Amino acid sequence: MSPLPGIKQFDLTGRAALITGGSKGLGLAMAAGLASAGADVVLTSRTESEVSTAAAEVAEQFGKRAIGLQADVSAPDDCRRVVEQASDAFGKIDILINNAGINTRGSIEELTYEEFQSVERINVDGVWLMAKAVVPKMKEAGYGRIINMASTLGVVGLSNRTPYATSKGAVVQMTRALALELAATGITCNAICPGPFLTPMNVPIADDEQTKKFIVGAVALERWGQMEEIQGAAILLASGASSYMTGSLLMVDGGWTAR
């Protein structure tokens, strides 16, 4: 048997990644993971000061090039601009992680149509717009990895989450459709479906008794996911180790969807 590449498949040295919503939470964790594997990274956020600070921290910690750019992924012009800026900075974009997203909670009677629309604009339109902007660059290179951040709520239901669950279900189907559309171009498209992670957004509710009861009842491992536990999935899908994966959903949910 000829030698197999093994762990070398996960090496991202020489790759350039663009991560939306990269200033904090899972986006920043994934950016750090990719940089630790050798990639140069561009992070985007709606808040310029936050994303600039995050990029500087990644660059200092891992010794890779890291740039922070302000962008609203629901704005087509912003999506085109950051793709051009990232491509100009690094000469290419090998990896796109569509991570930017928002959430809202409430019953269908409580929520307004405007609140519903705001979630869909960021979580669905933003994914499509970023993919639309980056695909021509990847096609020209004959290589690309598109990673969409979906959710367990894209495949299972949860009350009082209709806008978010609807948006993530759309991301699941967009991932599959794009995977088929791009299969012959050298571009793969996969999704990560996180379960409950202890992100900065969730820290305030982590000690709530009702939340604790839900985590124990729904998650097989009976705990929150930690930030570093998303990194392996991102590195896998961004690297050559996932070359035979496209249209796949990678469940990183502590066993929630195994029940």
Residue ranges and their predicted role:
Residues S151:
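Residue(s) in the substrate-gating loop at a strand-loop-helix junction
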Residues A183, T188, M245-G247:
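Short, small/polar-rich loop/turn modules that mediate ligand/substrate recognition or access, typified
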Residues E48-S49, Q70-V82, Y113, E228-E229:
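The beta1-alpha1 cofactor-binding region of Rossmann-like NAD(H)/NADP(H)-dependent oxidoreductases
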Residues S2-K8, V156, I235, T246-R259:
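Short C-terminal tail/terminal secondary-structure segment
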Residues A16, S23-G25:
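Conserved glycine-rich cofactor-binding loop
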Residues C79, S107-I108, T112-Q117, I215:
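Substrate-binding pocket helix/loop in short-chain dehydrogenase/reductase
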Residues A131, S167, T175:
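Active-site helix of classical SDR
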